[in-house]
Amino acid sequence: MNENRIMRKGAVREMNRYWLHAASGELSLARDNGKNIEKESEPQIILLNMEEFQQLEGNYPHRKNLISSMRFIRYSKVEAFHECVQGIIHVPKQGSKKEKEFSFGFYLFENKLFLIEEDEELQEILAKVKNDMFDGCTLHMVLLFICNALIDNDILYLQKIEENLEKVEDVVIKRIPEHFNEVIMRYRKQLSESRAYYEQLMNMGDFMQMYMNRESLVEEEQGWERYMNRVERLHNYVETIREYLQQIREMYQTQIDIHQNRIMSILTIVTTLFLPLTLITGWYGMNFPGMPEFQWKYGYLAVIGVSVLFF
């Protein structure tokens, strides 16, 4: 079975295979029209889905480990074995209804980088990172470029959240907004997902940096160090926004307390004003037979007059 052709539900499906030309650093889509134009020794980037990855012929060490990890993807991670480097990346949804979360796995073995996904998002990302490649670019660097491309627009997403929270703050200052808790909980959930995502990416970057150091790949090590620093800045920005969110919640609670204090002040004034009347009502509500006012024909009018004077 050719790696380029995988039988699936009775049809022949072409995998997307790219050749990375080491000398020029160019990335080109392989064209196989019955002729093996490219050299098999050239580094290859192969996009395929899970079923195709499972059906690949040949010896791919620890492939079952990656397949097992990809069945239930909940977080991003990377693992290095003696023969290969593999991992999964879970990219959370970022706010907009048009955006969606997606996940993919990667498997780096010899001169091949397999990118396994079901959502067909990586082809666009590869087209984007083609311009970043340079002479002598390696598959390790290609993987780094992909990871960098995944967070290119994250700062804009976080800035949008901060701007929206500023609008919420302006409303809270003027009045007590409706559905405040629902809005805050939505932003809190988004920020929690982003924080966990960046923590996982920092762990991945740290791991890859140590791996490159062990393999004496100096340029790749420096690249992963820069990536980790970039992710760390995004993580710190998320923490700053989370603190800002907490300040807005405290401001909202302060407004609630002020509003409740105003109500209690009004109730206290009303209670104080009507206290004498309440006292009179309590006295005469007991209906003791020894009260002289009950025997006096002007007693009723006298009590009314006293009440009016107190009020």
Task: Tell where the protein language model's regions lie, with residue ranges.
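Short, charged, low-complexity loops and linkers
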Residues: 36-37, 139-151, 180-188, 223-227
